[in-house]
Every structure is written in C-alpha cells, then in structure tokens.
C-alpha cells in the first residue's frame, strides 16, 4: 500500500480546506458521542472523514437526527457506519469492536465474543442488524481494492437541474477525479454504492459512478450468498462507487461520494 490511510489521508482534506480558504471546525467522534445532536446542530454543513467506519448507536442516531432537522451532510468517504462499536462509560478513549460472522475483517471474534462487554449489544456489522449505512447517508460499503483508483463518470441523473451546482465548471463528459494521491483517482480503496433494497431513499439522484475497477475489487463478503465466480468489478455491477444527492425534511440534504480515495483527489 503506497498511499496514506485514515488520519494522514484526512490531513489532505484539512490542507485543502485551508488552501481553498474555507473556514471549518474539527469535531471528533468523542465530541459527537458526548454531546449528540447538540454538537452538530449549529453547523451549516458537516463533512465526514475518509473512513468513518466505527460508530456506536449514539453517534449514528445524532447524525440521523441532524439530517432530519435541516442538517446538511457531505459524506465523502468509504466503508462508513459499518461496525457496531461500543464505548465504556467514563472511558471514551477506549472502544470495543467485535468482528463477528461476516464482513471484511482481518480477525475473527472467538466464541463468547458475539456481544460487546461494554454495552451488551450484539457485535458485528450494522448491516446485519437492519441498520445498513444506506439508511443514513444513502450509500453503503460494497468493495475494496488496493491497486488502482478510477474517476467517477456522469450518470443520467447528473443532468437534473437540482444537482447542476455539483458539476459547476465540469463538462458533460468530463471525468470526475481522474487524479489523486490514493492510487491515482477519486474512486477507489474502499467503495460505497447506492442500493434501494438496503435503505437508500427512493428519491435519491444517482449522479455519477465509477467504472473500470479491476477484479482486485471483489464484492464484499456480507453480500455473497454463494461460492461461485464472477464477483469482481468486471462482472458484477454492484462493484462500484456512487455519487448521490438526496434531500430530507425541513430542507436538509446529503451529498455522498462513496470512496475512501476521494478526499485525496481534491484540486
């Protein structure tokens, strides 16, 4: 792996904000967990980091409440809101995650580790508990790969007048992010997709998608129900990153681009 990850990747975003002259405050996961909706309520808009994968119920609930009360979120990361996460009361610096019986994981929970000691909740994926990430930001984890990133390409919804502002300065056929520090493009490393069956709001506009990922990007294991070939990007249309936009009640909105590489492809 020859590119930054997590905090070093997020520093690219902070540099870009400063370089572009945008004023922004930094809110940590600890802040959001301790203060809930009150932490986000004063914000005109909120932007995630590049890999917001570990969230307890409290921070997910605060994010949903913010969107439902005229909040505006830019989810520009990948593999977000993925793993059930617990914290010990009085010890916010310590989190607990149990990687249970599905999901992309580098270790497997042992017998007796199916429930978090810190909260008593069942561990594993939020997806398996009926709270797939698509229910919050419209996108959810679909693939990961480490070879090459690709640009996003326009989809038919990109020509809708409601999203013209997203493509200001781009031609109708211009690729979106055919450059970047994370494997050469804006779409890669970890990809999230639009999926109505998992909770993407039905009025969501699917404005752009990645294509041409290699077969080193397989479909995530939690969605593979049979052991047969054809689960790589060149054969499975679910293996892609999507860029979407949807509105919420009281004039809220979410613009989401499902890619960990995205924050390292800002001009």
Predicted regions and their residues:
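Aromatic-Pro/Gly-enriched surface loop or interdomain linker
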Residues: 1-39
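Intrinsic-disorder/low-complexity accessory segments
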Residues: 6-12, 49-50, 54, 72, ...
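Short, well-structured alpha-helical interface segments that form or flank functional binding sites
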Residues: 8, 12, 41, 58, ...
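Loop/turn elements at helix/coil->beta-strand transitions in domains of secreted/extracellular proteins
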Residues: 19-25, 41-45, 68-73, 202-203, ...
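Generic beta-strand/beta-sheet core signal
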Residues: 27, 48-49, 76-77, 209, ...
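Solvent-exposed loop/turn segments at secondary-structure junctions
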Residues: 31-34, 51-55, 79-83, 89, ...
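Short alpha-beta junction capping motif
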Residues: 40-86
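Glycine-rich, aromatic-lined ligand/substrate-binding cores of catalytic
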Residues: 91-94, 98-267
């Amino acid at each position: 792996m020859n590119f930054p990850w997590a905090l070093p990747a997020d520093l690219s975003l902070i540099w870009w904000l400063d370089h572009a002259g945008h004023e922004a405050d930094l809110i940590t996961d600890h802040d959001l967990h301790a203060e809930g909706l009150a932490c986000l309520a004063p914000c005109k808009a909120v932007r995630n980091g590049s890999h917001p994968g570990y969230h307890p119920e409290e921070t997910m609930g605060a994010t949903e409440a913010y969107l439902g009360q005229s909040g505006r979120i830019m989810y520009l990361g990948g593999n977000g809101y993925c793993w059930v996460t617990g914290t010990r009361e009085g010890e916010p610096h310590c989190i607990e995650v149990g990687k249970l019986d599905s999901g992309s994981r580098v270790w497997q929970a042992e017998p007796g580790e199916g429930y978090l000691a810190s909260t008593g909740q069942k561990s594993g994926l939020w997806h398996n508990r009926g709270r797939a990430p698509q229910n919050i930001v419209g996108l959810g984890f679909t693939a990961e790969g480490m070879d090459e990133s690709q640009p996003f390409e326009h989809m038919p919804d990109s020509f809708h007048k409601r999203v013209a502002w997203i493509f200001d300065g781009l031609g109708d056929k211009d690729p979106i992010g055919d450059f970047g520090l994370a494997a050469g493009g804006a779409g890669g490393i970890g990809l999230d997709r639009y999926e109505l069956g998992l909770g993407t709001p039905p009025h969501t506009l699917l404005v752009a998608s990645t294509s041409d990922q290699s077969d080193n990007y397989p479909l995530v294991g939690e969605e593979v129900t049979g052991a047969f070939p054809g689960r790589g990007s060149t054969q499975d249309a679910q293996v892609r990153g999507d860029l979407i936009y949807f509105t919420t009640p009281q004039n809220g909105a979410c613009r989401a681009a499902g890619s960990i590489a995205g924050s390292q492809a800002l001009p």
